[in-house]
């Protein structure tokens, strides 16, 4: 490997493959030709007459052509009660798909709930398809996803979550969040953040505290609940007033706000465990506040292998798992990251865990450095990690229908120019952050969620027009957003649910840049101090708080 190259991937044995074996690490290591989002990606298939039919025809034509010559896998899974069917001829995608999600049998065994009779979402993920580009397509009208000639699991997972999320919002008022969640002393904290701001670090870091349980690493389902007069917590999925007006899914919250006196309005609701109830509006105790509950989505977490940089002890299980796109590293990379690798190795050598000690005791520091360097070199290298093998089973939410009560929502950012460390957000500020969705590289992801199955261009055009109006008038962006007609339905869904989230939780802004504090020695101390800020905030749920780089010490010391 040339000295100026930091890492590289083994070449494909033939130019037509979309996946092949990488240099050994973990249980397996699959290299995918596409290692990120496909250049061609279309979430507005329904806007082009005949396109969906052509895509389905192409998929079935390819399946017929390879019938009997290559394995084709069809596997149904359950994602928060929604049944999803994937059809693929990719060994890698099938392998990760069945590991990632609950099968129908696993869902029923774990939750005690029977799966639906038929899938609501259909997925085709096929490689070797002649006449098709490396591309991804989504039809909202038919809940159909088609991926051609790409084996990168990350995009497949994200688009499936997005498609399921649209169903849950429209039909059930359930909010799908690209975020991570941890419980501490019975209170849940939900982190919402773009990549590169410390979401995983903040999640795993909080696990060093007592009375904590790990909930979610990447995706969370949130239900906003009312209390009934007999003490049950329910979320309303449909309502019909005595005046004939109706609402369903995400629309029910505002409808109830506007019809509080319609005591005989009929409601269809569900309990936290999915028991269906028929109620009237007078059965709800509307004097009680809304409460948010979060549910996990994945059976086994698909996460970045560079987790070992901040949490070295995770290396044991990551190296005992299936990998995707873990590269080889050069001597230049090892030299450039020597200090970081020395710290990781030091922690691994000091670990008292018996299995971990056995795995690493026979390896030299040079071998360990190379292994760990491979895990942290490429930002999109992934592992399929069973978190119950990293943490004790009683410290993990393993049942997808066991909720955690959310107390705090934390929007993470990493802005070196902003002296703010922690701030309790107003509704306008909370919504503006999510509408603009600025990432560390100055791009924009609405709701910090690139997974959403929406017309991104139409949404961004609507938001940017409102931003210009806000700049010219001085009116807060969210107020203009709320007042203007013509917003895409997907934006209406998303931000109505965020409005309800603000009512049901305490919402904060956290800037993960304590390394710029001259009193902080290194990154590890910065992470430790950030964890103390989060832990105290979750314990106390302070209102109106504003901490800066100059005064936050009194909060954590």
Please give the residue ranges for each predicted region.
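Conserved lysine of the Walker
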Residues: 199
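Short capping loops/turns at secondary-structure boundaries
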Residues: 149, 153, 175, 192-196
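Ampiphathic alpha-helical segments that act as solvent-exposed interaction surfaces
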Residues: 146-165, 528-543
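Glycine-rich, often acidic-flanked micro-motifs
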Residues: 2-45, 178-194, 208-557
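Long, basic/Gly/Ser/Thr-rich N-terminal segments
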Residues: 1-157, 450-451, 555-557
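Post-Walker A alpha-helix
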Residues: 202-203
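N-terminal pre-Walker A segment at the start of P-loop NTPase domains
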Residues: 154-178, 183
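A short, charged
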Residues: 121-129, 175, 465-469
